[in-house]
Amino acid sequence: MNSNTKIIFVTGGVVSSLGKGVTAASLATLLESRGLNVTMMKLDPYINVDPGTMSPLQHGEVFVTEDGAETDLDLGHYERFIRNKMTQANNFTTGKVYQSVLRRERKGDYLGATIQVIPHITDEIKRRICSGIADDVDVVIVEIGGTVGDIESQPFLEAIRQLRIELGRNRTLFVHLTLLPYIKVAGEIKTKPTQHSVKELRGIGIQADVLVCRCEKKFDDSEKRKIALFTNVDQDCIFTAEDVDTIYEVPLKYNQQGFDAKLVELLNLNAKEADLSEWQNVVNTIIDVKGEVTIAMVGKYVSLTEAYKSLNEALYNAGYKKGVKVKIKFVDSEDVNENNVESYFKDVAAILVPGGFGSRGIEGKIISIKYARENQIPFLGICLGMQLAVIEYARNILGIKDAHSSELEPTTANPVIGLITEWQAEDGTVHQRTHSSDLGGTMRLGGYKCVLKQGSRAREIYQADEVVERHRHRYEVNSNYVERLEEAGLIFSGRSEDNKLMELIEIPQHKWFIACQAHPEFTSTPRYGHKLFESYIQAAIENSNN
């Protein structure tokens, strides 16, 4: 971090899920549109080292960065909103902070000192914030996870309070997102929760510079004056976060209120006028869609759609590029069997089986894949979805009825999917993996090059000889079965650079049947979409028209 870099801290109050991530990403978009180099950070107060082993039903999606970090789903928002890519340095947790401090204590780096939250934990938080910012960055927006008042967030709030003192007011800014409940019966907007939230923040030693008030309807100047009076925040530093049809409208709404101009003024930034023409085009494309196409997503985390956040967005983005609204029909794979499978898919244009872990709901996914293959329904499999497509093909085309994955059935005699026995850690060291190895941080993670087969549909879609996609898996196609599968008509249209790992499969006789070991959804953005998803949606549109 250079001596001119500015830091905007975004906190949240009253309740969770107000949209801190979208607000932070929207501010980054606005500042980027003014010619500034902007990056972002997410600080998570949970004690897990990373979200890699957390249930998607509790935490939502685990977003994987290009350099192989398992991170919070908000980093997906960041990458979809701004051009800079996130890395391991852009997300850290309480667990990671404590892990670093305790390792240093064991090494004797603290020279016998008593290790305490202040100064040792707060110093490590400050170090990670400052060291994670490249020298060419003009502004970094740091989102503090959790809600003000939570005991877990206190070390982070104390650390940023100290940073304000150390860096000065001209280099730091506190933006606080809060809730203004609208009581329909009374027809009133209530400001009391916001007053108490700011009071709670002040009790920690932080005075908000800017307030963003989430409300389902616009509030007028009288409410602004009241909020300003009781929070010590200037009236012209209070902004509305109103509900919109698409989250990609949020930057435009903030710009209309002069939010970015106020940030430039408060931080004394040398910035040009905002050029939001490209972003306006993105929003216009979303708003102008005419048709609709329905995709069935067959998974086991469907009770929380946030578990598939990037995948949902990738499908929506592809639909916008093709001029249709994508409607996702979430199907719980545990409910699917041979007797009812048709009832789930009779009204859909395509089927998708996403990634996942564990044996629950596996047979329902395999039955769904078989239905798509036999009925010429466009199919896309991702990660586990590709592995199950290989298992289904081995069972029903090769006749290997007990074909399985050693992850799901360790004693299977025909493990067409097996464990990758060698993996590379974050520090670049190579380790050997067994079925009893730790689960956390021991996967094939991050961007890897995939070489595409000449003449394949994948090569035609990507219009390239090789691509880089992000991975998150421990298991791969067993190379001992590849030749037999190819002889039976399955094409391995993408392989790792060393030709050892199978990355893409397709069935040439099928209308559109592709599955990939990687997670291409992590690189889809509303600006650029993603070629694989666009081809898939096009196939779904054509199938729907027929």
UniProtKB/Swiss-Prot annotation:
UTP binds at residues 16, 190-195, 226. It is an enzyme of class 6 (ligase). Catalyzes the ATP-dependent amination of UTP to CTP with either L-glutamine or ammonia as the source of nitrogen. Regulates intracellular CTP levels through interactions with the four ribonucleotide triphosphates. Residues 1-269 are annotated as: Amidoligase domain. GO terms for cellular component: cytosol. L-glutamine binds at residues 356, 384-387, 407, 474. GO terms for molecular function: ATP binding; CTP synthase activity; glutaminase activity; identical protein binding; metal ion binding. CTP binds at residues 16, 150-152, 190-195, 226. Keywords: ATP-binding, Glutamine amidotransferase, Ligase, Magnesium, Metal-binding, Nucleotide-binding, Pyrimidine biosynthesis. The active site is at residues 383, 519, 521. The gene is pyrG. Residues 294-546 form the Glutamine amidotransferase type-1 domain. CTPSs have evolved a hybrid strategy for distinguishing between UTP and CTP. The overlapping regions of the product feedback inhibitory and substrate sites recognize a common feature in both compounds, the triphosphate moiety. To differentiate isosteric substrate and product pyrimidine rings, an additional pocket far from the expected kinase/ligase catalytic site, specifically recognizes the cytosine and ribose portions of the product inhibitor. Its EC number is 6.3.4.2. It comes from Francisella tularensis subsp. mediasiatica (strain FSC147). This is CTP synthase. Allosterically activated by GTP, when glutamine is the substrate; GTP has no effect on the reaction when ammonia is the substrate. The allosteric effector GTP functions by stabilizing the protein conformation that binds the tetrahedral intermediate(s) formed during glutamine hydrolysis. Inhibited by the product CTP, via allosteric rather than competitive inhibition. Homotetramer.
